Amino acid sequence: MPEEITAQVEEQAPEKKQEPGEHEHHGDQTTITEYLESLLVTVILALFGTSFVVQAFKIPSASMESTLLIGDHLLVNKFIFGGTGAWYEKLLPYRSLERGDIIVFKYPFADHQHFVKRVIGLPGDRLKLVDQQVFINGKALAEPYAVHDGAAPYDPLNYNFPPARSQFITAAMQPEWAEEMRKYVHGDEIVVPPDKYFAMGDNRDRSLDSRY
């Protein structure tokens, strides 16, 4: 009996014949679907990467010469600095900012602008410039990367910093920054505020940086 039933089923459901080109058409659809899926994954990873991991920048000015030249392209690691104190930072390759690091950051008075500078002062550091020499906590800072081309117009902030309180606001300084910075001047030094960093361009005569 089982054999007869099997035979009847086979007779009622004969094997479907494949139409010419059907296999090829199905294969084309599969290839297109796989391509679109791969493209979607690539776009998602690219968006994630530029938001959280890396981002490309182009040097717009001479403020970091001769370390970085106008037109140089950078791929910036946005992932390396943690700083939030979250527990997971201990499990990931985060590190704190260090003196000498080159950083890209948003200009405080115009969020659409990005600046490229070098970290000079860390939170709590006592900093001053005397005749263009940087002193940190009373010791001269060795800066083989610093350039003084002398081509820019004379600017007292490029030679001695911070200025005396009576001369603190100059035409070159942002008024908001001058007012804020005045609170951290002690004698002839400025104390870098908590959670803040003092950054300068390597080309000291042509850099709009933390002095301003």
Question: Residue spans of the language-model regions?
Answer:
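Soluble "head" domains of membrane/secretory-pathway proteins
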Residues: 2-32, 52-58, 63-212
